Amino acid sequence: MDKATGFNLTIDAIRLPYTKDVATYCAPFSCEDNDLDEFFATDAFLYDSELLGRTYAWVNAADPTQILGLVTLANDSVKAQFITSSARNRLQRSISNSKRGINYPAVLIGRLGVSTAYRNKGLNIGSQIIDFIKDWFRSSDNKTGCRFIVVDAYNNERTLKFYTKNGFKPLYKTETEEREFLGLDANDALETRFMFFDLKLR
């Protein structure tokens, strides 16, 4: 819940699997990001049909034709044996030595968008969606083990600030370190930063 406005995503919105029927019933969704808008308009349904990603919609309980936010989730893992030693130490810092391994189960936030109509109103919809995901995968109802939430966050100030505010950390401390790991030249754009959240931490 947002303390300032009293908006509570679990009360003031309804979570639904994002299907073509939901998309048809609701008003067109836009978060003013062309790539995200196109994904949610078309690709989200293809990912779902191929079991590659599942998208969820939060619609306004007072007006169910209005989509507040969308998120696409997929299974993933952090392959510790393939990352640099400094990044591996950063990742494993809170894991006991006896439980450290070469792979750690994770859930990937593939896409996350908040409707332009509901942004910048103090509702904190994006952060409340993140909180829902954290609680969902910590819950005893979760059918598989999952240690981390991971995201390839757009490498811009607003997006990085959002995920940092919600407890995510960059796997690589610097862009230079991440660029070197990815084999990018100095002039190549680093379009995303890999960030993680440890579900064992509160």
Residue map of PLM features:
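Non-catalytic substrate-recognition and accessory regions of acyl/acetyltransferase enzymes
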Residues: 1-121, 127-128, 135-150, 160-202
